[in-house]
Amino acid sequence: MTAAAPTDVCIIISAKNAADTIARAVASALAEPEAAEVVVIDDGSTDDSASVARAADDGTGRLNVVRFEENRGPAAARNHAIAISHSPLIGVLDADDFFFPGRLGQLLSQDGWDFIADNIAFIDAAQAATAHGRIDRFAPTPRLIDLVGFVEGNISRRGVRRGEIGFLKPLMRRAFLDQHGLRYNETLRLGEDYDLYARALANGARYKIIHSCGYAAVVRGNSLSGSHRTIDLKRLYEADRAILAGSRLSSDAEAAVRRHERHIRDRYELRHFLDLKNQQGFGRAFGYALTHPAALPAIIGGILADKTERFRPSGSPAPVALGGKGDVRYLLETLAVDQPQK
């Protein structure tokens, strides 16, 4: 085996029933000269995801497709890909999504990081073929984000855009992950990225963000990443509690993680109440609320907020699948400092 160069990147793609999009994702990763490995994990698909991924091979010997017989979740799929790869840098690409040309080179032009991420463009599936020509060009404007800023950037607030910093798709240094024993938490089916990045920051990771846009996130109404179970919320706030119990955090960082834990726990309490109402009737749900008074503010506040949210006008451009009119939306839009190229 040829020794890996310091800038060699392994791109990991976890796929579940992604036959319609996986070829585009694989092709965009293989088009990046810095991608020394592209590892696709077919996570128990019932369609032809694995064979479609193999058909996208460019013959350079960089593509490795592995199929799980049963679905194990994206965290397990990514951990397996990390275990069977060797490149010193690791990046994740969702099977619905794709890279814009030159993404990895732009990221690797920066120094002084353990994790580095760029802007994300949210687009509708119908825009994918022409999206690169429509993307605004932003100056990189690099900055480091600490644990407090990262966690606060994952807390949604009514009337403003939902917290999305955890959606960023950073390159990660394998050496840092190995040094601190960091891997994805396989009990999580929601927020596994947030949890890994938060634990890395708690261990002193230098997480750099640049504002140039190299990642296209294709938004679909039936996307697996857009749905979750009530139990997934419970496991996510329990992951926050594990960070609090297992890390020596500053007072500001501890307070931020506690706010995120409470935010996710409130979402869980509301969802659990609604599940009981739908499955066992209002009486059972009302009884739960009465016997769990600590959950009452989350339940009452959540119901009232949901009823008023439908009357709130959209305040920013968005793809159709996100309730907009087909516009491109940027995760780091408010930090844009450059004008679109005409």
Swiss-Prot record:
It is found in: Cytoplasm. Its EC number is 2.4.-.-. Pfam families: Glycos_transf_2. Its main location: cytoplasm. InterPro entries: Glyco_trans_2-like, Glycosyltransf_2, Nucleotide-diphossugar_trans. One of its GO terms (cellular component) is cytoplasm. GO terms for biological process: polysaccharide biosynthetic process. Pathway: Glycan metabolism; exopolysaccharide biosynthesis. Keywords: Cytoplasm, Exopolysaccharide synthesis, Glycosyltransferase, Plasmid, Transferase. The keyword Cytoplasm applies. The keyword Transferase applies. One of its GO terms (molecular function) is glycosyltransferase activity. Glycosyltransferase required for the synthesis of succinoglycan (EPS I). Needed for the addition of the sixth sugar (glucose), catalyzes the formation of a beta-1,6 linkage between the fifth and sixth sugar. Belongs to the glycosyltransferase 2 family. This is Succinoglycan biosynthesis protein ExoU. It comes from Rhizobium meliloti (strain 1021).
